[in-house]
């Protein structure tokens, strides 16, 4: 197995860090998977050769030497045998047909299972086309109704949603489940016989299995968040209750592809496997691919002889059996099962959402195999399809729950890391750099590890389990020598990464993550070997007993796993690498070529930059928001921290009849909300004032004045926490949608006792879209509003399955998750639960995407028995839909512009690199002092250009949080670069440049962001040059320095720059762009506005002043002095 090592050439902050580590991790995972394909193919070859020669297969030894390469054609042959094995299990029969003609192109040799009678044997009396053979029309083998069902399934867009199809043989009337799926050459029909007394023979029985699954899903959804272990324990209990298997396990795949049993329920006399770890080769990559295609796989009897599949000679390769449940297992898997005393098994895939970067799209590519739910039994038996489907349904629900749990876990981990980083930064200010190792929390608390160390200035500070000081120094020297061009290395095996001293570290230190913080200093995190955390969960052996390592068995798998991971640690997660990178960036910026006291001064300065409030900008935004709220067509109201109304727009005043003036200052809960809504609104208020914003909450408001005749105004609102400029919550704003008319009709409809058809079929626009389900989840009602919303008529959908045929077929849904969620909601409602405001979206007949809120209520007959459900759609108003569509179009345009910008950035970089290379060649020649200055000016202009192209996070700049570089620079070099950028325009217009810059200013050494101040001054100068009248015009640059003493021998220089020119000055709209955040009238105005924001990040400011005959930019900014001696020359 290849080492999980990563190098980092350079890092950027935030999302760039995460993207970099994710891409690296994705590449590593793919490489690991490809290496495992090689191992799997070789193991299969060894197993098959041992069988042919009569020798026993030494499983443990084969795994340990599995890393020898095999030819590519051998891997291809291996995959073909797994996916196109040409054998099935004898519990069912398989037919493959051409999809359009239904002509048989392949069939299994156990066709006698179909009881075809006289047709099964060719004879003179019967025409040849009636015999089950290649070319037979499969429809002739079944009853007319069965043939019609198969034809109906064949034209379905998503054929799997039509399963199972009940079919009967034409002669014997023997019933079968027909499970159909498409392959490259046609359609495969898996036929499984229905046994007498099978509880699932009727539609009611199939629905009952769904109800059992829904009950199990409800249990999962009721579990407390944040406990994946409890979730897995509950799943194995539910699956055992559904299937009755002797043993049910949850088997989780780790990042390095090995597996672990994380939950188990079993018969008391069976040996436990809980906690057992398996090597990655125990479940080959080819098998994992099969699980993604066919998520439930069953072995009825591992001892049964497989049945051969006969196929047409026209087919170019063996029939693909990936999607067929009867597909026979390979001999090695059957032998493994037999060795562990299991006869039949049921394996179900647990699929979760994969990484966006990894997936790169939708569909299966964006999904990831998280693990398996594995069932074993000691006697043979087939599980009927409806029960398998119910289990698959449960697995889909488990995948959804796991997605939420894993997201929550990632958020909690990230919060912990951010909190630790904040504390580490605080320590850095008080005691740099030793505070991050001598105080608590320390760097060891940043990520999960066994030890950590700081190597700084040739000295070591060590925490926990680490190498010795001499070994750490040796590792640092090795990194500098062999990985000198990278800023960090992370690996789960120092031995595999090539560190020559790995053997001397023993098992205590196997994995390492390092981050270089200066040219020769490092942070280290260490992990011990994985095997120390692994414990065998089985029965203890007598000392005299010995395991047979050659047999394929869980114990030999575990032994082989321990050999594989003996010198390997747990891999480093993406979020851990991101945390290390972030801390590395902070320290690299802080410790770059400066002493400790300089470090602290600079860090304080940098933090001050990031604490800008931008109160004037927030005020302008607030004014604009007030105007939008007052004129909005949606009802909007707001309350202060005490629940008193301080916002009441015209729309809510119109609906309630209460004028704005009277509403202000009233208590929302006590004066304006109906009693039945009080508890809901109080809870929403309480949560919002704590920062927890709720959505789609129903609020009933009282009516006044002209609206008094209405009982109430019913709003569905979203709560938004209102914050002041210091980010403290000061109130709550509610943005709502008026649903009064729909709610009144819906309530009457639900409560009605007699004939409801007059309401369902009413064309009244106030009637919401309504459809109904019978107890089998088939559509029994579809009103005119539903026809309008979906484009499908009543007659086209009545009697069809709501899941699959209507939603999923007629009205397409976005992905399998949407199908699963809708199925759960529908069955929960048919089980008696009421569903409120479930977000639901689909594509109508014309392909338009429709978003709605679904409310579902149970239907009962006179005896109170549940007979189905009523479902209501709440569709957003046309105005809101239009606004959303406009937003989507704007997002498309923005994305197109981003692509253009990315193209331009890339194409500019190439010639820029050429210029940089040419300059470096010039630097190596013999240059005069003036020529050296020209080359230096060119270099700083190149750096400015590079920085502008790299700084794409304008949103952070808008919010006042862009990160600034802090380094020593010479002010004279900056001024030369600024002037050089204006020289071409200056000469073209024949303008005179006047520079009034004191000599001490040119040589002044400062700390700050050299490139940013250069960009700001150059932008102001270029705009002045554009609007200076010519000829005989002039432009003057003046600099006035003032020294400030901070104490402790530290000095700050206040710099005043004046860029002056004669004439009328810059156009008024351009000056307005400089100071107006909301919009820009000109392209130049965008640059001016951004430069002003950059200046404010530096605690500076700019004004544009018009005086008689002249105008000028007045720029004020402060920088720390780099050397105290300079202070003596400044007054």
UniProtKB/Swiss-Prot annotation:
Region (Disordered): 1-30
Domain of life per record: Eukaryota
PROSITE patterns given in the database record: HIS_KIN (PS50109), PAS (PS50112), PHYTOCHROME_1 (PS00245), PHYTOCHROME_2 (PS50046)
Keywords, comma-separated and alphabetical: Chromophore, Photoreceptor protein, Receptor, Repeat, Sensory transduction, Transcription, Transcription regulation
GO biological process entries: detection of visible light; red, far-red light phototransduction; regulation of DNA-templated transcription
Matching CDD domains: HATPase_Phy-like, HisKA, PAS
Post-translational modification: Contains one covalently linked phytochromobilin chromophore.
Protein name: Phytochrome
């Amino acid at each position: 197995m290849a080492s999980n090592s990563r190098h980092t050439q350079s890092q950027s902050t935030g999302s760039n860090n995460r993207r970099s580590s994710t891409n690296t991790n994705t590449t590593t995972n793919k490489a690991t998977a490809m290496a495992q394909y090689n191992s799997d193919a070789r193991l299969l070859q060894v197993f098959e050769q041992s069988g042919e020669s009569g020798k026993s297969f030494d499983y443990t030894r084969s795994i340990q030497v599995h890393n020898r390469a095999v030819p590519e054609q051998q891997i291809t042959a291996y995959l073909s045998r797994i996916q196109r094995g040409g054998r099935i299990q004898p519990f069912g029969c398989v037919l493959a047909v051409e999809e359009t003609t239904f002509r048989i192109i392949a069939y299994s040799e156990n066709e006698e299972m179909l009881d075809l009678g006289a047709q099964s044997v060719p004879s003179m009396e019967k025409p040849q086309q009636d015999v089950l053979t290649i070319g037979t029309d499969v429809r002739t083998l079944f009853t007319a109704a069965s043939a019609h069902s198969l034809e109906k399934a064949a034209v379905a867009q998503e054929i799997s949603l039509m399963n199972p199809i009940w079919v009967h043989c034409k002669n014997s009337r023997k019933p079968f489940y027909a499970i159909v799926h498409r392959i490259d050459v046609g359609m495969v029909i898996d036929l499984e016989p229905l046994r007498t007394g099978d509880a699932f023979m009727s539609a009611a029985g199939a629905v009952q299995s769904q109800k059992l699954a829904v009950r199990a899903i409800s249990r999962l959804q009721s579990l407390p968040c944040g406990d994946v272990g409890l979730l897995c324990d509950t799943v194995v209990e539910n699956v055992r209750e559904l299937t009755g298997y002797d043993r049910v396990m949850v088997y989780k795949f780790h990042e390095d592809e090995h597996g672990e049993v994380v939950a188990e329920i079993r018969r008391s006399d069976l040996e436990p496997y809980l906690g057992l770890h398996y090597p990655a080769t125990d479940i080959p990559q080819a098998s994992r691919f099969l699980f993604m295609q066919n998520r439930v796989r069953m072995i009825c009897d591992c001892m049964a002889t497989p049945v051969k599949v006969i196929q047409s000679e026209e087919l170019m390769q063996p029939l693909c059996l990936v999607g067929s449940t009867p597909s026979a297992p390979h001999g090695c898997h059957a032998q493994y099962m037999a060795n562990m005393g299991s006869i039949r098994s049921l394996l179900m895939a647990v699929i979760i959402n994969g990484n966006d970067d990894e997936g790169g799209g939708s569909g299966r590519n964006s999904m990831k195999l998280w693990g398996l739910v594995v069932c074993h039994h000691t006697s043979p038996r087939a599980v009927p399809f409806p029960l398998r489907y119910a289990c698959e349904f449960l697995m889909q629900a488990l995948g959804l729950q796991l997605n939420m749990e894993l997201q929550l876990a990632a958020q909690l981990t990230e919060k912990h890391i951010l909190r630790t980083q904040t504390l580490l930064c605080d320590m850095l200010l008080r005691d740099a750099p030793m505070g991050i190792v001598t105080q608590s929390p320390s760097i060891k608390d940043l990520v999960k590890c066994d030890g950590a160390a700081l190597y700084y200035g040739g000295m070591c500070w060590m925490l926990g389990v680490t190498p010795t000081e001499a070994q750490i120094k040796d590792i640092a020297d090795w990194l500098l020598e062999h990985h000198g061009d990278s800023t960090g290395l992370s690996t789960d095996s120092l031995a595999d990464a090539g560190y020559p001293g790995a053997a001397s570290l023993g098992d205590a230190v196997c994995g390492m993550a390092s981050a270089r913080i200066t040219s020769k200093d490092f942070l280290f995190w260490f992990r011990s070997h994985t095997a120390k955390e692994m414990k065998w969960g089985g029965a203890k052996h007598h000392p005299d007993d010995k395991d047979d390592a050659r047999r394929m068995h869980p114990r030999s798998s575990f032994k082989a796993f321990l050999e594989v991971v003996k010198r390997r640690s747990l891999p480093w997660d993406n979020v851990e690498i991101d945390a290390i990178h972030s801390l590395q960036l902070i320290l690299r910026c802080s410790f770059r070529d400066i002493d400790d006291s300089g470090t602290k001064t600079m860090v304080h300065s940098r933090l001050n930059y990031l604490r800008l409030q931008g109160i004037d900008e927030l005020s302008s935004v607030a004014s604009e928001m007030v105007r939008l709220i007052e004129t909005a067509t949606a009802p909007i109201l707001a309350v202060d921290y005490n629940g008193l109304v301080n916002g009441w727009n015209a729309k809510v005043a119109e609906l309630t009849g209460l004028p704005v003036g009277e509403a202000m200052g009233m208590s929302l809960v006590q004066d304006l909300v109906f009693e039945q809504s009080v508890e809901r609104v109080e809870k929403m208020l309480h949560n919002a004032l704590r920062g927890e914003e709720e959505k789609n909450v129903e609020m009933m408001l009282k009516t006044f004045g002209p609206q008094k005749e209405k009982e109430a105004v019913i709003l569905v609102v979203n709560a938004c926490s209102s914050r002041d400029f210091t980010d403290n919550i000061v109130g709550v704003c509610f943005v709502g949608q008026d649903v009064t008319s729909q709610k009144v009709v819906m309530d009457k409809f639900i409560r009605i006792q007699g004939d409801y058809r007059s309401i369902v079929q009413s064309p009244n626009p106030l009637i919401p879209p309504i459809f109904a389900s019978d107890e089998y989840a088939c559509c029994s009602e579809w009103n005119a509003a539903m026809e309008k919303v979906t484009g499908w008529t009543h007659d086209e959908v009545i009697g069809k399955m709501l899941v699959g045929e209507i939603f999923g077929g007629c009205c397409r849904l976005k992905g399998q998750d949407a199908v699963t969620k809708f199925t759960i909601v529908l069955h929960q409602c048919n089980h008696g639960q009421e569903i409120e405001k479930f977000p639901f979206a689909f594509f109508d007949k014309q392909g338009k995407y429709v978003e709605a809120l679904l409310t579902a209520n149970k239907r009962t007959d006179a005896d109170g028995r549940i007979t189905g459900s009523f479902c209501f759609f709440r569709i957003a108003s046309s105005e809101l839909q239009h606004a959303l569509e406009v937003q989507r179009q704007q997002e498309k345009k923005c994305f197109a512009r981003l692509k253009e910008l990315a193209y331009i950035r890339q194409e500019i970089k190439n010639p820029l690199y050429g210029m940089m290379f040419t300059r470096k060649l010039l630097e190596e020649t013999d240059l005069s002092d003036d020529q050296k200055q020209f080359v230096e000016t060119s270099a700083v202009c190149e750096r400015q250009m590079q920085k502008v192209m790299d700084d794409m996070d304008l949103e952070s700049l808008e919010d006042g949080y862009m990160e600034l570089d802090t380094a020593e620079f010479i002010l004279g070099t900056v001024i030369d670069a600024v002037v050089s950028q204006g020289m071409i325009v200056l000469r073209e217009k024949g303008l005179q440049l006047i520079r009034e810059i004191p000599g001490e200013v040119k040589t002044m050494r400062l700390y700050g962001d050299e490139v940013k101040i250069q960009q700001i001054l150059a932008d102001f100068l270029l705009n002045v040059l554009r609007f200076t009248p010519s000829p005989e015009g002039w432009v003057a640059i003046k600099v006035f320095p003032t020294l400030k003493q901070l104490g402790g021998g530290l000095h700050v220089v206040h710099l005043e720059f004046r860029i002056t020119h004669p004439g009328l000055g810059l156009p008024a709209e351009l000056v307005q762009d400089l100071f107006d955040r909301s919009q820009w009238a000109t392209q130049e105005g965008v640059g001016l506005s951004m430069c002003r924001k950059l200046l404010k990040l530096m605690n500076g400011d700019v004004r544009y002043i018009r005086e008689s005959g002249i105008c000028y930019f007045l720029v004020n900014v402060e920088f720390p002095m780099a050397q105290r001696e300079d202070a003596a020359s400044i007054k």
